[in-house]
Amino acid sequence: MSITAPGIYEMDDATYHADPVEAGSLSSSGARTILKSPALYQWERQHPVYKDVYDVGHAVHAKVLGVGLDTVEIPADTLAANGATSTKAAKDFIAQARAEGKVPLKADVIAEINTMAESVLSHPLARALLERPGQSEASLFAPDPETGVWLRARIDRLPDAHPAGRTIAVDLKTGRSADPAEFKRSAADYGYDLQAEWYQAVLRQVRDDDDTAFVFIVVESTAPHLVSVIELGGTFPQIGRDRMRRAIDTFHHCRETGEWPGYDPVVHYVEPPRYYEIQNEEPAA
């Protein structure tokens, strides 16, 4: 598959991440990496590595959304006496499953994933957002109006366009905490503000729809698997748009010049963070 026109497409996860745009495209995760360092972005693009830390997230997505990578149970008789996947039989099974595009997990992890999915679908607002007519794992592609750089986005749940309603795109996340007060720190740490603005910008282009919103459905990875629905507000949207613009411009410049720099080649003078100073203050007499 080769993408040459803006639009919303159906494709599997592997095709999307392989980048089907002939001229190359930039995703929101790539944008967040390029803001750290263009050199890091270029290295990761040329040396992709699958991280099994994402296995649970992929499995929960597939269970809730009904699309995605298939989950397969690692046979109990291949495990070590302590339940570890350190035996040759277990390693061979895992390698074969990954080669087939599946997510290999132990039975207890699969049971936990099923419970997480049930928690999401038992949440009235989360369920309502996910059950609207639409497309799961929708792949969107459109060029940036300012630079011509192709942008791509993969939205977990994209509702069908409705002339009388607002388009609320959904991203499903698993994490340590779904507490909204803690999620705002995660949003800042992991660049979810950029992700939200990125997805909406691409969506507005392919649908010509200015009335969009983006929410996160967050489910905790430990029991009782609490769920919350969160929309980023305050200055998050503007910060996200600013970071998005900077990432696209940086990508465009690097591609035009063929230079993907790392950190500036100077001596970097750093001062201790405030928390470290407080930890080491002399106690009051």
Language-model regions: role of each:
Residues 61, 157, 244:
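A residue-level signal for conserved active-site and pocket-lining positions in enzyme catalytic cores
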Residues 38-41, 174-179, 222-228:
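Short acidic (Asp/Glu) and glycine-rich catalytic loops that position anionic groups and cofactors
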Residues 153-185:
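Conserved catalytic cores of phosphodiester-cleaving nucleases, focusing on short active-site segments
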Residues 123-132, 159-168, 204-212:
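Secondary-structure boundary elements
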Residues 1-152, 265:
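Metal-dependent nuclease catalytic cores that hydrolyze phosphodiester bonds in DNA/RNA
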Residues 148-152, 164-167, 222-225:
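Coil-to-beta-strand transition motifs
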Residues 6, 186-193, 198-285:
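Metal-dependent nuclease catalytic regions and adjoining charged, substrate-binding loops involved
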Residues 46-49, 98-105, 180-191, 233-235:
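Short histidine-centered catalytic/ligand-binding loop motif
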